[in-house]
Regions:
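GST-like domain detector, emphasizing the conserved glutathione-binding G-site
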Residues: 1-191, 195-198, 296-309
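Short, mixed-charge aromatic SLiMs
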Residues: 97, 160-164, 250-266
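Residue-level signal for nonpolar/aromatic packing positions in well-ordered secondary structure
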Residues: 115, 135, 204, 223, ...
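GST superfamily/GST-like fold recognition
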Residues: 171-176, 214-243, 247-256, 260-261, ...
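Cytochrome P450 catalytic-domain "roof"
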Residues: 206-214
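Acidic/histidine-enriched, glycine/proline-rich intrinsically disordered or flexible terminal extensions
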Residues: 275-309
Length: 309
């Protein structure tokens, strides 16, 4: 049976669509994200990155992956690690800032978050760190915090960190895209990814029924990685009405953990940094000093998303 017989073109979306022998890129590919997706890597324009006064320079936006790192940095500061002071520069991914030459030098994959450590432990030249999971591990090891040193506990924390790294694309790029962002609603795609996300939520719920935090009784980078993705979903603060669609209230242990983690000062502050949507009082477009949380949130500038960025 040929593919045409197996998958009649008239039943495809759009009707009559048949994949070509060789795919070619068109600028409109990607729907709502067409302006930030392309099939090649590298810089599109020359632009240096700003550098502030602190050794740690973060270039990011308040997406779930970006929030992981700002939560970690704020948790380190709350725990007394004063050397974790940082500058957080806003990279507007919708405007293509991540394709500037300076950003590509820090992360050749052109994705946020990206970190430059101008005071690495080896005393050498500034060190780039990219991929959110890598940044979390790097900071945990640099400051000796939020990642257990005992082998079994460390392994469990890393198990769940990498669970998040592997699972979240199904939540965001899969379910979130087809449920909230795709130009048309495709029943097959939504059903496929809704099933997977509910399975993931059940994995978390069963685990958290027996554990206070992801790695047991201790709060770690695993919690920081998972909360911005699955905690926000549990709070019905992701992908429109997806929380109701997925019946997230039924995951009682995820709900308990979500609220417990969300009450932490480091989480509250980290959630605000580089945030460009939501209540203006929760948006701190850039963070260069601890006092910025009191003086530079967007409500202080009339809620203008372009102000002070």
């Amino acid at each position: 049976m040929t593919d045409t017989e197996k998958f009649p073109p008239e039943k495809n979306l759009p009707a009559g669509y048949v994949p070509p022998k060789v795919w070619t890129w068109e600028p409109g590919n990607g729907g709502a994200f067409a302006s930030i997706n392309r099939p090649v890597a590298g810089a599109t324009h020359v632009k240096d990155l700003p550098v502030g006064k602190h050794p740690l320079q973060l270039y990011s936006q308040g997406t779930p992956n970006g929030v992981k790192v700002t939560i970690m940095l704020e948790e380190l500061l709350a725990a007394g690690h004063s050397d974790a002071e940082y500058d957080a520069w806003l990279i507007r991914i919708g405007d293509g800032n991540q394709f500037g030459s300076g950003f590509v030098e820090v992360n050749p994959n052109s994705k946020i978050p990206a970190l430059m450590d101008h005071r690495p432990k080896d005393g050498g030249k500034p060190l780039r760190v990219f991929e959110s999971g890598s940044i979390l591990v790097y900071l945990a090891e640099k400051f000796g915090a939020f990642l257990p040193t005992e082998a079994r506990a460390r392994t469990e924390a890393l198990n769940w960190l990498f669970w998040q790294m592997g699972s979240a694309p199904f939540l965001g790029g899969g379910f979130g895209h087809f449920y909230a962002y795709a130009p048309i609603k495709i029943e097959y795609a939504i059903n496929r990814y809704a099933m997977e996300v509910k399975r993931q939520m059940d994995v978390l719920n069963r685990h958290l029924a027996e554990n206070e935090y992801m790695a047991g009784s201790t709060y770690t980078i695993a919690d920081m990685a998972i909360w911005p993705w699955y905690g926000r979903l549990a709070l019905k603060d992701a992908y429109g009405d997806a929380g109701d669609f997925l019946s997230v209230d039924e995951y009682e242990h995820v709900q308990r953990w979500t609220k417990q983690v969300g009450e932490r000062t480091g989480v509250k502050r980290g959630f605000m940094v580089n945030r460009t949507s939501g209540d203006p009082s929760s948006q701190l477009l850039e963070r260069h000093d601890a006092s910025d949380f009191e003086t530079k949130t967007q409500d202080k500038f009339g809620g203008d998303p372009a102000a002070k960025a």
